Amino acid sequence: MPDIGTHADGDLKKYMDTNENLKAQTAQVGTNPHNVATISYLEYVAPEGLGGKIYQAANISYADEAAPDLAHFEEGLRASGNTNGHSFTNTVIGHSYGSTTAGKAMTQVAEGTVDNFIMCGSLGAGAESTDQYNIPEGHVYESSVPEGDAVQGLGPDTEYDTNPKKLAAITHLSGDTTDSENYKIPGEDYVRNTGHPFKQAADILGAPFLNHDTYFDEGTRTSQDFSNIIAGGKQTTDDKRAAIEMERGK
């Protein structure tokens, strides 16, 4: 479930690439990627992002309106699988505003529809507790980059509900995106090392959000954790991560 500023016509390749990466990484936990299907749900009107009407991101109505449709879509996937005798693990991942939208949908979806729910860089959980989700106990997850993602929990609790990091009974996945080629060190070190004055000004203003879009980047521990859950596994252990990095020649 994508973020603010998402448009099917301009962002399709980005999400196709993300989907392929998530599929490929399931091989690290012994799953054949050819047995994995990934979907980017773009059938909702997302608030505009930077360069557009950014104030729309403060409006919860976009999430409220989209949540029932997402819930019905997920129920349709499950019903189709059941009708055709296909058993599958269904994992929903929501990023930023999309995680709040998905969270609201998970309170409405029929039980037995979704097996795992992951929120990353979340404005708010769309619920006050994991008990409100129609998700099996122990199968709700969150991922939060420690630096450069001030979006986490930014939405007011009265509308966006609890910051996922503070939800009881939630499983915390890795927030490590330092292996992303897009990862930046927030604060003075990064600004001092950029050589373009105008870029410096932009980075100072945007520093709190520099790493908000790095969760799904190829090679990150966050995206590997997501792939593990998709494959029905657990988050990446330190030993497994070391083995992956050795395989990649790091």
Role assignments for model-derived ranges:
Residues 93-102:
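Gly/Ala-rich beta-loop-alpha elbow adjacent to hydrolase catalytic centers
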Residues 103-107:
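Short, hydrophobic alpha-helix immediately C-terminal to the catalytic nucleophile
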